[in-house]
Amino acid sequence: MREVISIHIGQGGIQVGNACWDLFCLEHGIQPDGQMPSDKTIGGGDDAFNTFFSETGAGKHVPRAVFLDLEPTVCDEVRTGTYRQLFHPEQLISGKEDAANNFARGHYTIGKEIVDLCLDRIRKLADNCTGLQGFIGFHSVGGGTGSGLGSLLLERLSVDYGKKSKLTFTIYPSPQVSTAVVEPYNSVLSTHSLLEHTDVAVMLDNEAVYDICRRNLDIERPTYTNLNRLIAQVISSLTASLRFDGALNVDVTEFQTNLVPYPRIHFMLSSYAPVISAEKAYHEQLSVAEITNSSFEPASMMAKCDPRHGKYMACCMMYRGDVVPKDVNAAVATIKTKRTIQFVDWSPTGFKCGINYQPPTVVPGGDLAKVMRAVCMISNSTAIAEVFSRIDHKFDLMYAKRAFVHWYVGEGMEEGEFSEAREDLAALEKDYEEVGIETAEGEGEEEGME
């Protein structure tokens, strides 16, 4: 079996996690108490969904996941929510003190008290796997826990499980919408360790997802629940091939192989189509070509950046539902002829496609329409550098005056770590710039890129 362990860190990570497990349970027909009437092999079996769920002897399906937070309220919502019987109480780990939007608290003072307990629980889950293939992390980097404890945990996982791949879904601060003044600090410090300790990071940002909800689903004032349900659909599409049997299945490590040209260039853009409300879906026939085109629309991107300003290096299309390879090939061929969608000249093929025959599932009472087919795209584009340069600019404005820095230093950080992280990100922006430059014929690859 190729199991995957999910790790949800901080409030953002846990709430996205809730939406995901809610959806996974619906997709597999698992009830809130963990029973699965359709599962014929009680207490074990080698079904595809066992990558995400382990089974007890009594036929209960338990997610291979841990939820970590430095304060109890969000974990308590899981403990008392609809799916309270689904999770093992040991999988919900909460501290008593908040990280207070402070990376240093999450990473040094308070995080380090809880991190060994977390690793211990993760070790228990890992021992329960026959062939662990990697970890999927869920966190936001604007706050203190997701950024601080998130990076601490990723660093420790690199040490304990060196070769296992780590994929993260990282919620980045948005250009306009802000939840904390010190977001730029936390994000820069956190990205510094994401650079080293994750293999693929999928960038999401609330503002981009808000706009999609507002525009495509006609929700006037989207709530976090609306956002998380949409994000859950994306994550579900990416992991569908791990959880169901399909024609062209894609493994977690395959994402890495196909999307990451250089180790540092591993921040991905994602998009999902069709995002459409039930009223509209009734009137529209969404063909494979149409959903493929709309997944390349700048407006469909789940992070605020314009892919037309950059070049694609690689692109992974995960189709699900009523889709045949012939249609996919035709749709991709059309995309390649479009002038607006540019690939770097050293990546001529650039597409990896997966098809999964399980149609998308919708949450009852949710916003999305039930459709026959959907596509999720993850792409590596040089345009994502916009996200970094935006954060770096905000970081510089604050750091020039050393504003708020004493809160971090007071928790045992050194000021040097700020400039180190900032320089690392400056180098990353430079890397993205170089990757997009046309290579001159005959001189081959640039040296100096690692």
Swiss-Prot record:
GO cellular component: cytoplasm; microtubule
Residues bearing PTM N6-acetyllysine: 40
Highest taxon above the source species: Eukaryota
Amino-acid positions noted as binding Mg(2+) in the UniProt annotation, renumbered to this chain: 71
Active site location: 254
PTM text: Acetylation of alpha chains at Lys-40 stabilizes microtubules and affects affinity and processivity of microtubule motors. This modification has a role in multiple cellular functions, ranging from cell motility, cell cycle progression or cell differentiation to intracellular trafficking and signaling.
Residues engaged in binding GTP: 11, 71, 140, 144-145, 179, 206, 228
Name the record gives this protein: Tubulin alpha chain
Organism: Euplotoides octocarinatus (Freshwater ciliate)
